Design a protein with these regions (language model features):
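Intrinsically disordered, low-complexity regulatory/interaction regions
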Residues: 1-5, 45-46, 107, 114, ...
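Structural detector for short beta-strands of small beta-barrel domains
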Residues: 1-15, 61-81, 108-110
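Acidic (E/D-rich), amphipathic helical modules within compact regulatory domains
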Residues: 12-64
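A short macromolecule-binding patch
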Residues: 27-31, 88-94
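Short nucleic-acid-contacting surface segments enriched for D/E, G, S/T with interspersed K/R
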Residues: 33-47, 96-111
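OB-fold/S1-family single-stranded nucleic acid-binding modules
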Residues: 53-68, 113-125
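Extended, charge-rich, solvent-exposed interface segments
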Residues: 78-87, 95-101
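Long, low-complexity intrinsically disordered regions
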Residues: 81, 90-91, 105-110, 124-125
Length: 125
């Protein structure tokens, strides 16, 4: 690691759409820019390395099976969501919305997990 701080603790958990949740149910916030850039979806396995200076380093260690779909961006109660062809709606991270400059009506390629409530955007169509 760049700052040469030693690893104090390593924790494993699952991504819930916004956070990593470990086996005991403890929640660790995942930076939205990392989750968005890595296209994390619910169920992905993460490793968190906590350095002695308190710095968090997340690493994805396993991918959950992805369901790919084409959806349309909708504005719901001042939050953008992605609606698939079957009418299911998925939440999207704010960082993803900003990165892709998503607006209502845009068509996107996205992916989610079985039973997922969150989607990762792959591309704007």
């Amino acid at each position: 690691f760049q700052n040469e701080a030693k690893i104090l603790k390593t924790v494993f958990g699952q991504f819930d759409g916004q956070n990593m949740v470990d086996e005991q149910g403890k929640i660790y916030p995942v930076p939205g820019n990392y989750a968005s850039k890595s296209r994390l979806i619910e169920g992905d396995s993460l490793k968190l390395m906590i350095l002695e200076d308190g710095t968090y380093f997340f690493k994805r260690v396993d991918l959950v099976q992805r369901i790919k779909f084409i959806g349309r961006v909708l504005d719901r109660d001042e939050h953008l969501v992605i609606k698939d062809k079957e009418g299911r709606q998925y939440r999207v991270l704010e960082e993803t919305i900003r990165y892709f400059a998503l607006q209502e009506g845009m068509e996107v390629a996205a992916e989610t997990s079985e039973g997922g409530r969150w989607a990762a955007i792959v591309n704007v169509i």
